[in-house]
Amino acid sequence: MRKVITAAAGSCLLAGSLGALSIGSEARASDVVGHAYVNQNTTGVNTLSVFDRHADGALTPTPGSPFAIGGAGLGKGLGSQGAVQASGDYLLAVDAGSNEISVLRAGSDGVPHLVSAPVPSGGVTPVSVTISRSGVVYVANVGDGGSNYAGFRLGSDGSLRPIPGSTVAVPEGSGVGDVLFNEQGNRLVGTRDNTSLIDSFRVGEDGRLTAAKGSPFEAQSLGPIGAEFRPGSPDQLYVSNAHAGPGNGTVSAFRDTGNGTLKSIGSSPYADGQTAPCWVEISHDGRYLFAVNTASANLSSYTINPNGTLTLLGTTAFRNGAGAVDARLSPDGRFLSVTGGRGHLVTTFAVSGGDLTELPSSPVALPAGGSPTGLVVL
């Protein structure tokens, strides 16, 4: 089982497990331009909550939401980023309670349809999944007796098949918080939040992993969880460090030297002066980074300079004081949605450079029950 190092660390796990608030949402008149999906992580049969995404950024529940997805959730916080991901019309969601991955096809109306029976995750307690452009999939499993990175291939028909010889064991108790590919799909990293290490791998044409020289690397602070590669600069990696205690949150910046070896950028790690930055998101143009400070109930905004160093711009509070458990930008980059938190909510901000303004229609409520973890915005 995963250990909690500090109260701040626990906030990343517990933020999504509190009771739901009753938040009303007005019907929106603007056109539906897409959808948002949240892994509810419910026990018994797991579900996805789905929202219609409107042109003005507002979210309204899709009729029939939430939808059953086949496997079982864990019902408590996963402390991870990437519990649901998308590739084309397909959605992949972790079922942490049944050690499975569900593959669904999203309809034009946003309704997800299960492609087949959930697939075993290749380990115990899957918490994060990532998909490369070529259809290689890796899952981070964190449970005792099956803590690893396990590889699969996603077929054009939505089939998910294990890659022989792809599984890489991770020491039990490491608590992997995120697994992700770079844009090119030739590098993969995983964060070990309980031991403050970062795994880095080269990805072969066969989809199997080779550990980079020197891996795992020191995270530069306690509790690395969320991670993102910089769009347009696949050699630059940013990791949020959540466990250093009140007011001591940081974001680490690394450069891949070309073979998967990670080197520090500038004076990394970069302080945000907040508590438990558990998740990160980067603007599509690669110019701004947003860190979600779960225990401080706010977001920090940074400028990413051309050389990869960070400059802190400031913080933006959630209107209702809620924490958070994942964040994603809309495809056009105009809106940032943050899911989970105290009360089962999705909060949405308008984005202007590094400035964030919560929408008047925000937040919207998620169904009670489970522990919402993971967000996809399409």
PLM feature segments, named:
Residues 51-59, 104-111, 151-160, 200-208, ...:
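Short loop/turn segments immediately following beta-strands, especially the blade-tip
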Residues 341-348, 352-378:
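Blade-level signature of beta-propeller repeat domains, shared across WD40, Kelch, NHL, RCC1
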Residues 41-43, 53, 96-97, 106, ...:
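Short loop/turn segments immediately following the C-termini of beta-strands
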Residues 16-34, 41-42, 208, 353-355:
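C-terminal region of N-terminal signal peptides and the immediate post-cleavage residues
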Residues 31, 69-87, 120-136, 168-187, ...:
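Beta-rich, blade/repeat-based domains predominating
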Residues 63-75, 114-119, 163-170, 210-218, ...:
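A short beta-strand motif characteristic of beta-propeller blades
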Residues 45-49, 100, 146-150, 197-200, ...:
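Structural motif
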